[in-house]
């Protein structure tokens, strides 16, 4: 899993410039879902929804500072109860004291805070920017560096995952679920020269849709622009290209880390009976329509890669119907022979057929003042927010989402609106979000008074090499993938 990668920026989804050979190979051997959507175009809500199979509004993870209840069953709980070794290497953006949520083992710290400090406040005008709001800094300062926090982190994530795979190969007593979660290509975009130099600046195109005039932009886009200060910066074409160049380099960097993990899976002899699933928590606008980062319902922010590979179990293929990351949990359970609720895509992996079903996406965080939702049905995308006019796009005729068809399609909008009313009690949801924000702000004030609370995860020292209470020579012997039998001298110890 990676962070902030839109499907459209990968060659497997048609991009002609980005270099991602590891993901290309995975796509060639697996099933590519061409229209997969995140449950929310924001990190923590999307990840929590993926792991529980429930929308953010159903589990109370409204934003990046909302806590997933420890009592909420996750994919990891279900697999662990069935005997699986459940392990996480990398970020998952858990908030609160429970930093495992069913993972039996966690190999690294997280890369984002686990506290409540990033709680939005819908009562505050967007012009009063909170300190943690996205700014244009990442767009203005991308480039080459010898090292960065994000690359250091992802290097460690890959290394720990590779080591875990070797451990699993040595002891096959239990089936395993290993989640490897990288922070790239999330901004800031600062990469080592070998990744930056893979791209010629003349290859980097400008956005297909430039900055939309304020008089023509939808209200939510304007809110995001105001929140991040986009209109306060006049970007040159070279600056836009440089930011996109850095993002492409970040994709190549994380693709190489993914290749290391997949290579270790094969080297450990585990590839033939392991299902590999690749996705991202949300996308990246990357200057399209003048927007950057996520938090929007447009395709670059909401549509994510979803690739499932299990050579020998199902043939390579492509699925065009809309699906959701909410479908991952029931799919994984069915593939593992376990029961679960929700829409499983296991059948689609066999025959490519998904069936008709609306795909729902929510946004309940900073940048709105009331709940906003999106529905994808067939070729149409519908966006609803009580504060804004309806949006309706025909993605087959208008893939760049330039023409709002809502005024000319009242019957279709009425059908979508009825589905919104059926799925959500919007006044109650809005009140719940506001109440949650108020409660968390009080807790933040309390916990930042006196001795601050710290919920960040730190792997226990006893899990590290040569720090546990075991024989050093035996530990070193077992650390070899092709461990020899114990010598007579060791047996006598």
Predicted regions and their residues:
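Formylglycine-dependent sulfatase
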Residues: 1-384, 390, 399-415, 451-493
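A contiguous, mid-protein "functional segment" used to position or interact
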Residues: 407-451
């Amino acid at each position: 899993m990676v962070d902030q990668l839109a499907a459209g920026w990968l060659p497997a989804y048609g991009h002609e410039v980005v270099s991602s050979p590891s993901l290309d190979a995975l796509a060639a051997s697996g099933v590519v879902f061409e229209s997969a959507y995140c449950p929310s175009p924001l990190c923590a809500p999307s990840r929590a929804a993926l792991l529980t199979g429930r929308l953010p509004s159903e589990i109370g993870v409204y934003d990046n500072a909302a806590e997933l209840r420890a009592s909420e069953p996750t994919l990891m709980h279900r697999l662990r109860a069935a005997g699986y070794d459940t392990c996480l290497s990398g970020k998952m953006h858990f908030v609160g004291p429970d930093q495992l949520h069913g993972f039996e083992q966690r190999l690294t710290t997280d890369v984002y805070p686990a506290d409540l400090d990033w709680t939005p406040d819908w009562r505050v005008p967007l012009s009063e920017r909170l300190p943690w709001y996205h700014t244009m800094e990442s767009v203005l300062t991308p480039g080459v560096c010898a090292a960065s926090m994000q690359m250091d982190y992802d290097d460690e994530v890959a290394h720990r995952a590779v080591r875990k795979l070797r451990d699993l190969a040595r002891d096959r007593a239990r089936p395993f679920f290993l989640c490897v979660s990288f922070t790239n290509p999330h901004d800031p975009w600062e990469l080592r020269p070998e990744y930056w130099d893979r791209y010629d600046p003349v290859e980097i195109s400008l956005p297909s849709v430039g900055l939309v005039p304020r008089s023509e932009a939808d209200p939510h886009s304007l809110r995001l622009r105001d929140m991040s200060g986009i209109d306060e910066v006049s970007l040159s074409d070279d600056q836009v290209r440089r930011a996109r160049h850095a993002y492409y380099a970040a994709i190549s960097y994380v693709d190489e880390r993914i290749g290391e993990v997949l290579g270790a899976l094969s080297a450990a002899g585990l590839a033939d009976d392991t299902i590999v699933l690749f996705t991202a928590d949300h996308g990246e606008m990357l200057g399209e329509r003048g927007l950057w980062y996520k938090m929007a319902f447009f395709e670059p922010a909401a549509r994510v890669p979803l690739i499932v590979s299990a050579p020998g179990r199902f043939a390579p293929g492509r699925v065009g119907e809309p699906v959701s990351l909410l479908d991952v949990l029931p799919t994984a359970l069915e593939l593992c022979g376990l029961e679960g609720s929700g829409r499983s895509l296991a059948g689609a992996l066999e025959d490519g057929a998904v069936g008709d079903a609306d795909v729902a996406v929510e946004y309940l965080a900073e940048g709105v003042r009331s709940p906003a939702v999106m529905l994808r049905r067939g070729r149409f995308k519908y966006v609803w927010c009580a504060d804004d006019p309806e949006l309706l796009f025909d993605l087959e005729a208008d893939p760049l989402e330039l023409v709002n068809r809502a005024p000319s399609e009242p019957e279709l909008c009425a059908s979508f609106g009825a589905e919104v009313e059926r799925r959500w009690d919007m006044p109650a949801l809005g009140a719940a979000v506001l109440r949650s924000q108020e409660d968390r702000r009080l807790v933040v004030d309390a916990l930042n008074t006196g001795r601050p609370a710290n919920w960040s995860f730190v792997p226990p020292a006893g899990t590290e090499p040569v720090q546990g209470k075991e024989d050093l020579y035996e530990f070193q012997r077992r650390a070899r993938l092709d461990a020899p039998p114990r010598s007579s001298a060791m047996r006598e110890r």
